[in-house]
């Protein structure tokens, strides 16, 4: 039986990394690439604030082709939808069978993605649905929402110390948007990515740690 050809929605963080790992262990799927939305004004991963250079290094460490979906800044819902639907229409013509997402719990997000693909022959796949992902890779906290999570955690390692220090009420996987991560090593990579932590800045109501390639420091 032929494997399903799939592409993975890649955020640069832990959930998409673990979704990749589950696919790598499966005999049902052939991973043909990853795709990511990038803020064209800053050349950074949307929401996570990770540099495109590091995004490319992740793809190289995984041995997978990367498709960048550029979105403007600021980006309206209409502009975002236009960019995503353009990508979907393009890959639907390339023999791709499905798109994989690392969503865990939120039904509304899952329904939104299913609706996006409903008119195509692409299948939406959720390989992590309902699974906890507390300790899955070596990651750094790239972004925090200071309304939910202390600013001091930006640039912190995602480890037992970090999890123990989280205030009550914060999801340990950051599934309510409390924080976002960058994966620099893990079972899904062929080799680790050398990084360092640069400036920590506050922008648009979020606190971002500028994660740098090690040689840039």
Predicted regions and their residues:
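Nucleotide-activated chemistry modules centered on ATP-dependent adenylation/adenylyltransferase
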Residues: 1-217
């Amino acid at each position: 039986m032929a494997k399903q050809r799939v592409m993975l929605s890649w955020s640069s963080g832990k959930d998409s990394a673990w979704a990749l790992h589950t696919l790598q262990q499966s005999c049902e799927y052939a991973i043909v690439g990853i795709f990511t939305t990038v803020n064209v004004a800053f050349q950074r991963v949307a929401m996570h604030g990770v540099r495109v250079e590091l995004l490319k290094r992740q793809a190289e460490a995984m041995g997978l082709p990367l498709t960048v979906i550029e979105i403007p800044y600021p980006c309206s819902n209409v502009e975002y939808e236009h960019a995503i639907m353009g990508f979907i229409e393009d890959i639907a013509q390339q023999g791709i069978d499905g798109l994989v997402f690392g969503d865990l719990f939120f039904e509304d997000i899952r329904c939104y993605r299913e609706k996006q693909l409903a008119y195509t022959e692409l299948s939406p796949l959720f390989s992590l649905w309902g699974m906890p992902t507390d300790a899955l890779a070596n990651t750094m906290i790239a972004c925090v929402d200071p309304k939910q999570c202390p600013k001091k955690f930006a640039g912190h390692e995602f480890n037992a110390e970090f999890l123990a220090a989280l205030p009550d009420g914060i999801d340990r996987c950051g599934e309510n948007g409390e924080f976002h991560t960058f994966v620099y090593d893990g079972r899904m990579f062929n080799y680790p990515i050398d990084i360092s932590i640069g400036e920590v800045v506050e922008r648009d109501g979020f606190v971002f740690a500028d994660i740098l390639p090690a040689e840039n420091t």
